[in-house]
Amino acid sequence: MLNNIVLYKNAFLNLHVKIVDGRKFPNKAILLISVMDHVRCGYIVDNRIRLDNTICTAFEYNWKVFVDSTPPTVWTPFWHMKKESFWHFYPIHTLADIDRLVKPGETASLGRMKREIKYAYLDNELFNIIQETSGRTELLTVLKTDFLSLR
């Protein structure tokens, strides 16, 4: 597990995000923090991140805690997390249907996502790591230090 946590720390440090004036947009980091909060609290127990209000509420709460401004919609980082190697969508129909939802670079609306995405899920190893307090804490520290320390 030690080698794998290093891989996921590196993946978190290298999230595909917008950078302006040397600052990384924190949207994906806040979403991951929210997912880890849900795992810690027992809202997520089966590696299924659903398109529902619980993740939305957690994202908005964490955004206000760490960024202290009006939060954007959670569905933008939820959609764009598909660029990360550890984040996956479980399709209602086919993965090709998900790929056809929007043009490259665009964000699918919540309605479109709900028609094609049953839920998102993490690599099993990553999910196992964040279920453990020590692993979750290490990954949270990476996100908070890299994305939120200058706020």
Ranges and model annotations:
Residues M1-R151:
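Intrinsically disordered, charged low-complexity linkers and terminal tails
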